[in-house]
């Protein structure tokens, strides 16, 4: 039988789990000794591992939780179970977990390696995961593993580990007491330096102060608007033996000049009258007349139409 003095102490509130493979007589004996160990102020709560998530225990309810330590228990504790244990443990509380492990397991195997179990305890919010013991299985226990879990490897053993919940609630926060920053005093200003860089109105009118006139910095040539041809690079578009071609990303205006030469100028032609009565007004104009809507005009008078009116007509 386990040395309960290393698992629990007097006055603690303890939860112990069991499953369908646990020995009923061993469970009763183990719980009885637990109650003696935590008496007179402590209590022992017995939970079926499959119902632990449904028990709805309050946060930080137990000083210690014992998982799989009852003789005959073959449970493999899921990450959800471990997270629930971390929730119901008090800050600083401990969990003792005992389960079957294998040295080398394939993906999809029901068992885990000792390293994987230690990692899951840490991911659940527990710390200081340490191994207490590791024992090989008896032939009868190996046969039970094959029947219950379907694992036929010869590298199965029983491992017991202990982990603790940190001395604070998971997700809790606390304000940091940072040292107050010292207020830097402004350095005194040297009045001699201020006077050196300060110009008064009298200084501006002083004949001894040589001030530059910004208008005198430019001559007449600088003020002339540049001709586009003067902005072109040397040899840009020149030479009768080659076709004029603008540079890539042209900025001198040659590209626009060549584009204008390619596009022929289109001057809209005056629309002729088909009936000769257009000048009389809308009353004498047909429905498709381009002069429809315009005032009457003298015969032979030149009237220019907007290209938009020609398209509408």
UniProtKB/Swiss-Prot annotation:
Binding site for [2Fe-2S] cluster: 236, 247, 250, 252
Cofactor (UniProt): [2Fe-2S] cluster; [4Fe-4S] cluster
Region: Linker, residue numbers: 179-223
Localization of this protein: Cytoplasm; Nucleus; Mitochondrion intermembrane space
Residues given in the record as [4Fe-4S] cluster binding sites: 275, 278, 286, 289
N-terminal signal peptide: none
Motif mapping: Cx2C motif 2: 286-289
Record Gene3D superfamilies: Vaccinia Virus protein VP39
Superkingdom of the source species: Eukaryota
A molecular-function term among this protein's GO annotations: metal ion binding
Region Fe-S binding site B, residue ranges: 275-289
Cross-referenced SUPFAM superfamilies: S-adenosyl-L-methionine-dependent methyltransferases
Chain segments carrying region Fe-S binding site A: 236-252
GO BP, sorted A to Z: apoptotic process; hemopoiesis; iron-sulfur cluster assembly; negative regulation of apoptotic process
UniProtKB keywords: 2Fe-2S, 4Fe-4S, Apoptosis, Cytoplasm, Iron, Iron-sulfur, Metal-binding, Mitochondrion, Nucleus
Residue span of region N-terminal SAM-like domain: 1-178
A cellular-component GO term for this protein: nucleus
InterPro entries, per database record: Anamorsin (IPR007785), Anamorsin_N_metazoan (IPR049011), CIAPIN1 (IPR046408), SAM-dependent_MTases_sf (IPR029063)
Domain notes: The twin Cx2C motifs are involved in the recognition by the mitochondrial CHCHD4/MIA40-GFER/ERV1 disulfide relay system. The formation of 2 disulfide bonds in the Cx2C motifs through dithiol/disulfide exchange reactions effectively traps the protein in the mitochondrial intermembrane space. The C-terminal domain binds 2 Fe-S clusters but is otherwise mostly in an intrinsically disordered conformation.
Family per record: Belongs to the anamorsin family.
Oligomer status and interactors: Monomer. Interacts with ndor1. Interacts with chchd4.
Role, per record: Component of the cytosolic iron-sulfur (Fe-S) protein assembly (CIA) machinery required for the maturation of extramitochondrial Fe-S proteins. Part of an electron transfer chain functioning in an early step of cytosolic Fe-S biogenesis, facilitating the de novo assembly of a [4Fe-4S] cluster on the scaffold complex NUBP1-NUBP2. Electrons are transferred to CIAPIN1 from NADPH via the FAD- and FMN-containing protein NDOR1.
Protein name per its UniProtKB record: Anamorsin
């Amino acid at each position: 039988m386990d040395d309960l003095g290393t698992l629990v102490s007097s006055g603690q509130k303890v939860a112990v789990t069991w499953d369908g493979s646990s020995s009923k007589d061993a469970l009763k004996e183990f719980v009885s000794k637990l109650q003696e160990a935590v008496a007179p102020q402590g209590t022992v709560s017995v939970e079926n591992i499959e119902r632990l998530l449904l028990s709805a225990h309050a946060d930080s309810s137990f000083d210690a939780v014992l998982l799989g330590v009852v003789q005959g228990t073959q449970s493999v504790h899921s990450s959800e179970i471990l997270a629930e244990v971390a929730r119901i443990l008090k800050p600083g509380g401990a969990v003792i977990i005992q389960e079957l492990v294998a040295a080398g397991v394939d993906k999809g195997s029901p068992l885990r390696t000792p390293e994987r179990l230690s990692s899951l305890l840490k991911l659940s919010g527990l710390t200081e995961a340490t191994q207490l013991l590791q024992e090989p299985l008896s032939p009868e226990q190996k046969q039970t593993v094959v029947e219950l879990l379907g694992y036929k490897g010869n590298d199965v053993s029983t491992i017991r580990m202990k982990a603790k919940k940190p001395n604070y609630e998971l997700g809790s926060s606390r304000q940091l007491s940072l040292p107050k920053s010292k207020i830097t005093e402004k350095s005194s200003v040297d009045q001699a330096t201020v006077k050196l860089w300060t110009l008064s109105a009298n200084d501006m009118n002083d004949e001894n102060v040589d001030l530059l006139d910004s208008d005198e910095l430019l001559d007449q040539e600088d003020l002339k608007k540049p001709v586009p041809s003067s902005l072109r690079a040397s040899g840009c578009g020149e030479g009768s033996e080659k076709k004029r071609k603008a540079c890539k990303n042209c900025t001198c205006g040659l590209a626009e000049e060549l584009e204008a030469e390619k596009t022929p100028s289109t001057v809209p032609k005056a629309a002729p009258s088909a009936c000769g009565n257009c000048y009389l007004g809308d009353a004498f104009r047909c429905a498709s007349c381009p002069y429809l809507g315009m005032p009457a005009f003298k015969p032979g008078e030149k009237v220019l139409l907007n290209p938009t009116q020609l398209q509408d007509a």
